[in-house]
Structures are given as structure tokens and as C-alpha cells.
């Protein structure tokens, strides 16, 4: 039997709630891998975390070995194999991701220092909390003993959004879209690039799409999709973000 430890910050939040059950479904790791799950959030969420713990127990996941609920980062991160830094101040209506930098910088700085002190030096870290790319850099700056290549920020949500919009445009299933790239930051300055994309292993679809749609519809829609969801839902992306973390992890 193999074991691995996974810590999730912001564990009482909507993204983590959607993510936890996908991870424990057992499809990421080998079937004989047992997960030591650590759920971390602020003290005010203690009651919520306990409720989530009860739900997890009720699922009777074969993949789950142990579960720890804590508000202490050093407990959550101790000897960890994987850390998902989901917890951060969320973006609300009218805010850009850059507005979150000052509010979240100290969170990721402090967590980085603790990770560097107590986690395995081989730990793999995925930064989800926005602005994810900046927060990942902050974590890197505070984890000198952990290789930079072990730390990544979430861009898969933008790629998934781009694939979905493109597949809808050409009338093909999203699984047929490959080699689509999103350059830049997880922000409105990102550049979804379909110049090398393929649909069913062919780039012939490019002949059916005009430049006006690419530059005036496709790219802005991907760039502003997060704001569009907030406008309609009143909250930032949760289930789609969790699904993207799962894809990134997988």
C-alpha cells in the first residue's frame, strides 16, 4: 500500500468543497494509494470544517486513510507530499485579480515560510488563490529549499474555458480540442492562442474562423469569463475552478 499526504488550504470554501470529493474519488493516484488528507482554514470556520469532515467520512472513500482538520499551517503542511493553496481572499464584483495582491501577499508569504520549514523538500505545490501567478512567485520566494519547478499556479481553468468556447464555435465536442495554449497570467492580459490548436487532430478548422471572431469575441470572452461568472452568480468560479485544479493535478 502506498501513502501520500495532501494539504488543502481554504478548505471550508466553495472551491475546496468541490475539489475534496474529486480527489478522494481515487482516480488521481494508483488504486492502492491511501491519502492522508489535511484540511486547513481559519479558526472561524471550525464548525464548517467539522461538517465537511463528517461528509467525507460518510462517503466511505476507499482512498482515504486519515483526515485532519486544523487551523494550524504547521500541522497541515508537516511532511506533506502535495499542497493545494486554495485559500485566499476571493474576488468580488468589480474587482480585478490585481486588487487582491496586497490582501493575499502576507498569507502566501507566511505559508511559504512554514512549508519550507516543515514540508518534504520534494513537496509539489499548486497555487490556486488569486492572483495565482503572483502568489506562486511569493511562495517561491519564501521556500528556498524547495525546487521552483515543484511550484505551479493554476492556468488550467483558462485553458478549459478556451477549449469550451472554441469547441462550441466549431460544433465539435470539447474533447476533440488539443494543442490550445493560453499565454501570460491568470488575468485579463492573458492571451488564448489557437494558432497551433487542432480539432480531431487537424487544424483545418482555422479556415472556417475569421480573425474578427478570434480577436473581438474569443479572446475577450476567455479573458473576462471570470468576471462574467461573478456578474451572473454573484460569486467567483468554484466548481469549474475545482475541476481545473483536478485536471492540473492529474
Task: Give the ranges of each region predicted by the language model.
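C-terminal substrate-binding/catalytic lobe of Rossmann-fold NAD(P)-dependent dehydrogenases
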Residues: 143-152, 157-250
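Conserved NAD(P)H cofactor-binding loop of Rossmann-fold oxidoreductase domains
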Residues: 87-89
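Conserved N-terminal Rossmann-fold NAD(P) cofactor-binding segment
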Residues: 25-80
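Redox-cofactor binding/interface segments in oxidoreductases and associated redox assembly factors
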Residues: 83-85, 127
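N-terminal Rossmann NAD(P)H-binding glycine-rich loop of SDR-like oxidoreductase domains
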Residues: 8-12, 20
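Residues forming the Rossmann-fold NAD(P)(H) cofactor-binding site
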Residues: 17
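Rossmann-like NAD(P)(H) cofactor-binding subdomain of soluble oxidoreductases
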Residues: 96-165
Amino acid at each position: 500500500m502506498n501513502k501520500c499526504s495532501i494539504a488543502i488550504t481554504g478548505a471550508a470554501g466553495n472551491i475546496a468543497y468541490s475539489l475534496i470529493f474529486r480527489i478522494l474519488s481515487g482516480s488521481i493516484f494508483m488504486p492502492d494509494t491511501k491519502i492522508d488528507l489535511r484540511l486547513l482554514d481559519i479558526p472561524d470556520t471550525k464548525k464548517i470544517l467539522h461538517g465537511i469532515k463528517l461528509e467525507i467520512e460518510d462517503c466511505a472513500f476507499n482512498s482515504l486513510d486519515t483526515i485532519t482538520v486544523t487551523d494550524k499551517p504547521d500541522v497541515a503542511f508537516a511532511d506533506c507530499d502535495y499542497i493545494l493553496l486554495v485559500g485566499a481572499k476571493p474576488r468580488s464584483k468589480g474587482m480585478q485579480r490585481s486588487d487582491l495582491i496586497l490582501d493575499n501577499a502576507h498569507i502566501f508569504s507566511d505559508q511559504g515560510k512554514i512549508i519550507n520549514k516543515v514540508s518534504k523538500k520534494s513537496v509539489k505545490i499548486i497555487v490556486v488563490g488569486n492572483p495565482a501567478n503572483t502568489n506562486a512567485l511569493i511562495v517561491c520566494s519564501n521556500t528556498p529549499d524547495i525546487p521552483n519547478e515543484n511550484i505551479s499556479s493554476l492556468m488550467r481553468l483558462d485553458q478549459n474555458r478556451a477549449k469550451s468556447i472554441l469547441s462550441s464555435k466549431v460544433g465539435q465536442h470539447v474533447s476533440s480540442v488539443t494543442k490550445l495554449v493560453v499565454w501570460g497570467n491568470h488575468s485579463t492580459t492573458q492571451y488564448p492562442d489557437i494558432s497551433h490548436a487542432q480539432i480531431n487532430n487537424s487544424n483545418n478548422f482555422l479556415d472556417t474562423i475569421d480573425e474578427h471572431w478570434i480577436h473581438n469575441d474569443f479572446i475577450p470572452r476567455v479573458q473576462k469569463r471570470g468576471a462574467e461568472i461573478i456578474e451572473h452568480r454573484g460569486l467567483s468560479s468554484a466548481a469549474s475552478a475545482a475541476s481545473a485544479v483536478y485536471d492540473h493535478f492529474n
